[in-house]
């Protein structure tokens, strides 16, 4: 690990792939110092692949069994997984204390745990979505029954959840959501807020009658509350409710959980009317020029995948949500990743009728509107 840490970024700034160049540097070092072949091969692999785990966890949906199976195939065995996990966590935390938070800790741990399971049972027995859903249900139900709920209390709510919910939520998230929704059943909308381990992040869950403007209004409101969203899970229930889950990083003047819930509740009265707040670009970001790049591709389930790379800045997600609302585009999932001063976000989209955005003119108009908004040419 020490050697991988010393060499993993040694080739930055030399042009080309710094991971491959660093691995080549280490290979020469290992030969000249007579390191054992097996150890040298392991460290060389770690240097070459040191971004693999972080990239997979932040850019892809690790609740998807295919993603886990593919990652397990690249790692190949438990030894490589263990070393890569340690190096990845150390690399993120060592780059800047602000980059390491409770959410990234959980994200890396989830990827590690799922991959370890695949490697234990064997790559010839890949993860199966149906098995994961069943296990998640059973684990969550057992915890709820321990807390005093009966199966008859829980099942009516769970029957309204889409099957994807039991694939994308962890058992502890389902327990938390279920307890909160049932305790607030008399309310028109249920809003839950909890601190994550480490107390630098919050998880927020909103269940509310589905309608236009919810995501845009919630993102704008969270921004006004000085909460930076870095993960959003957006689902729709079978009985017409939006199920929106956000992981946010606390700001310097973040209000308490009760005030956050009250503010979000007020915003839900007319979410489509809430416009993004205006922000001055921090001086530290003015010297970074990241060209905005927007690409569209087809996604499973009659959806469109939008990949967006741009300079990170305050209010970015709120602005994106507002443009999507104006163009009558629905958001079904969002994965937000920040690498230094660059944001790399992925959104799963559809039109208002829940179909993919297939018209080239519509995609061109959406791309142009986003470019105008994100590059300061707001209409």
Which residues fall in each region the model found?
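Regulatory modules associated with amino-acid/nitrogen control
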Residues: 66-379
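Divalent metal-dependent catalytic cores for phosphoryl transfer on phosphate-bearing substrates
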Residues: 1-125
């Amino acid at each position: 690990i020490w050697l991988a840490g010393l060499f993993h970024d040694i080739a930055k700034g030399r042009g080309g792939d710094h991971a491959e160049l660093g691995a080549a540097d280490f290979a020469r070092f290992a030969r000249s110092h007579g390191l054992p072949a097996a150890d040298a091969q392991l460290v060389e692999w770690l240097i070459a692949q040191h971004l693999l785990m972080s990239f997979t966890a932040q850019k892809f949906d690790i609740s998807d069994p295919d993603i886990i199976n593919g990652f397990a195939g690249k790692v190949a065995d438990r030894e490589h997984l263990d070393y890569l996990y340690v190096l990845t966590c150390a690399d993120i935390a060592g780059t800047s204390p602000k980059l390491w938070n409770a959410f990234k800790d959980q994200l890396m741990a989830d990827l590690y745990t799922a991959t370890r399971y695949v490697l234990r049972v064997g790559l010839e027995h890949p993860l199966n979505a149906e098995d994961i859903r069943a296990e998640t249900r059973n684990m969550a139900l057992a915890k709820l029954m321990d807390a005093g709920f009966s199966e008859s209390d829980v099942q009516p709510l769970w029957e309204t959840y889409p099957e994807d919910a039991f694939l994308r939520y962890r058992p502890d998230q389902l327990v938390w959501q279920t307890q909160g929704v049932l305790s607030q059943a008399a309310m028109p909308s249920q809003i839950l807020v909890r601190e994550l381990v480490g107390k630098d992040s919050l998880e927020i869950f909103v269940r509310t009658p589905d309608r236009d403007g919810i995501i845009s209004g919630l993102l704008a409101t969270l921004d006004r509350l000085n909460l930076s969203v870095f993960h959003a899970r957006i689902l729709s229930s079978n009985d017409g409710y939006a199920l929106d889950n956000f992981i946010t990083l606390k700001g310097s003047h973040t209000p308490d959980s009760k005030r956050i819930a009250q503010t979000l509740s007020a915003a839900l009265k007319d979410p489509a009317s809430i416009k993004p707040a205006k922000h001055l670009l921090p001086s530290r970001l003015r010297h970074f020029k990241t060209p905005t790049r927007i690409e569209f591709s087809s996604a499973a389930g009659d959806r469109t995948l939008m990949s967006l790379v741009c300079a990170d800045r305050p209010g970015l997600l709120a602005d994106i949500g507002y443009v999507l609302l104006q163009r009558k585009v629905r958001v079904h999932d969002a994965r937000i990743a920040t690498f230094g001063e660059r944001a790399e976000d992925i959104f799963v989209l559809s039109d208002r009728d829940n179909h993919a955005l297939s018209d080239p003119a519509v995609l061109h108009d959406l791309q142009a509107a986003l470019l105008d908004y994100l590059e300061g040419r707001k209409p």
